UniProtKB/Swiss-Prot annotation:
Coiled coil: none
Entry keyword set: Protein biosynthesis, Transferase
Species per Swiss-Prot/TrEMBL record: Streptococcus pyogenes serotype M4 (strain MGAS10750)
Function: Attaches a formyl group to the free amino group of methionyl-tRNA(fMet). The formyl group appears to play a dual role in the initiator identity of N-formylmethionyl-tRNA by promoting its recognition by IF2 and preventing the misappropriation of this tRNA by the elongation apparatus.
EC number(s) per entry: 2.1.2.9
Protein name: Methionyl-tRNA formyltransferase
MF-aspect GO terms: methionyl-tRNA formyltransferase activity
Spans through the membrane: none
Record-linked InterPro entries: Fmt (IPR005794), Formyl_trans_C (IPR005793), Formyl_trans_C_sf (IPR037022), Formyl_transf_N (IPR002376), Formyl_transf_N_sf (IPR036477), Formyl_transferase-like_C_sf (IPR011034), GART_AS (IPR001555), Met-tRNA-FMT_C (IPR044135)
Example of a GO cellular component annotation carried by this entry: cytosol
SUPFAM superfamilies to which the protein is assigned, alphabetical: FMT C-terminal domain-like, Formyltransferase
Annotated positions binding (6S)-5,6,7,8-tetrahydrofolate: 110-113
Length: 311
C-alpha cells in the first residue's frame, strides 16, 4: 500500500481525494487544506470540501495559513508518506517537503503548458476556448512547470460555466490520476517535459475583471459571464448600483454598448459592441439572485428602451 499525503481545498480536490480513498492501493496519512473561513453576512465558519471529507474518514487534518516555515510542516514531514498528491491546493510547497518524499504529483485543471496558475477553468471559458482538460504533472518549485505524466481533454459547451466545467474536470482528473499513477510509479510511464515557450498563465481573478465591458462582442461578453459563474460573478452597474449577471443568452440586435434595445415583461436585451445579449438571471445590489422576469417586475421596471447600463 502506497502512503500518501493529500493537499487540496475545493470540491475539485475532494473529488480526487475520494477516488484515492476508495482505492485500496493507497493510504491517506493526512490532508493539508486551507484554513476555515468566515463567509457571508453572518460570518458563518465554512470548512473546505477536502476537510469535510477528511473528517468523515477520520484522517488527520492540517490547515496552516502558510505551509512554509510552519509547525504543521514539521508534523507533516514526520508522517512518513511515500508521496504527495495535490489538486487545487492554493499554496506553493516548500522544497524541504518536496525533497522528503519519493514523488509529488499535481492534478491541474488545464492542458499544460496552457493556463498555469490558480484559475485555469475561468480563463478557458472567458477566452472562448473550445476545449479544456486536466494534466497530471510532477511538482517542482516553479508553478505548474513540471514534466507531464498524462493529459485528458473535454469539449467546452456553450451551456458550460465554471461550476459545470469544474465538476466535469474533477471527474476526469480523478480518473486520469488513478489510471496513470500505477504506471508512473512503476516507471512504465515516462513523464514528458513541457514546452515552456508555449506557457500561458491564469492568475486569480481580480475585482477589475469581474466588471463587464459592453464594448466587447456579444460572444465575448457571453463567455465572460459564463467564466465568472458561479464565482466570483460578473457585474455591471445600474444607476450606480452593482448588478450581478449570472446567466445570459446570445441575441440579435444593434445599439450603443450597454444600451437597452428590447424590453418586454419577460425579456431584457442589451446591446454589445457587436450583437446583443438577453439577460436571464441577475442579482441587484442587496437582493437575492432572481430571474429576469422577477427583476423586470421590480427594480428593473423603470428601465426603458434606449437607457444605457454599465455607467
Amino acid at each position: 500500500m502506497i502512503k500518501l499525503l493529500f493537499m487540496g481545498t475545493p470540491q475539485f480536490s475532494a473529488t480526487v481525494l475520494k477516488g484515492l480513498l476508495d482505492n485500496p492501493a493507497y493510504e491517506i496519512l493526512g490532508v493539508v487544506t486551507q484554513p476555515d473561513r468566515a463567509v457571508g453576512r453572518k460570518k458563518d465558519i465554512k470548512v473546505t470540501p477536502v476537510k469535510q471529507l477528511a473528517l468523515e474518514h477520520g484522517i488527520s487534518i492540517y490547515q496552516p495559513e502558510k505551509l512554509s516555515g510552519s509547525q504543521e510542516l514539521i508534523e507533516i514531514m514526520g508522517l512518513g508518506a511515500d508521496g504527495i498528491i495535490t489538486a487545487a491546493f492554493g499554496q506553493f510547497l516548500p522544497t524541504l517537503l518536496l525533497d522528503s518524499v519519493s514523488f509529488a504529483i499535481n492534478v491541474h485543471a488545464s492542458l499544460l503548458p496552457k493556463y498555469r496558475g490558480g484559475a485555469p477553468i475561468h480563463y478557458a471559458i472567458m477566452n472562448g476556448d473550445k476545449e479544456a482538460g486536466v494534466t497530471i504533472m510532477e511538482m517542482i518549485k516553479e508553478m505548474d512547470a513540471g514534466d507531464m505524466v498524462a493529459k485528458a481533454s473535454t469539449p467546452i459547451l456553450e451551456t458550460d460555466n465554471v461550476g459545470t466545467l469544474f465538476e466535469k474536470l474533477a471527474i476526469i482528473g480523478r480518473d486520469l490520476l488513478l489510471d496513470s499513477l500505477p504506471a508512473y510509479l512503476s516507471g512504465e510511464l515516462k513523464p514528458i517535459p513541457q514546452d515552456h515557450s508555449q506557457a500561458t498563465f491564469s492568475p486569480n481573478i481580480s475585482p477589475e475583471q469581474e466588471k463587464l465591458d459592453w464594448t466587447m462582442s456579444n460572444q465575448e461578453v457571453f463567455s465572460h459571464i459564463r467564466g465568472m459563474n458561479p464565482w466570483p460573478v460578473a457585474h455591471t452597474f445600474l444607476e450606480g448600483q452593482r448588478l450581478k449577471i449570472y446567466e445570459a443568452q446570445l441575441a440579435e440586435g444593434e445599439g450603443l454598448p450597454g444600451q437597452v434595445i428590447v424590453k418586454t415583461k419577460k425579456s431584457l436585451v442589451i446591446a454589445t459592441g457587436q450583437g446583443a445579449l438577453s439577460l436571464i438571471v441577475v442579482q441587484p445590489a442587496g437582493k437575492p439572485k432572481m430571474s429576469i422576469i422577477d427583476f423586470l417586475n421590480g427594480i428593473g421596471r423603470k428601465l426603458e428602451v434606449g437607457d444605457i447600463i454599465g455607467r
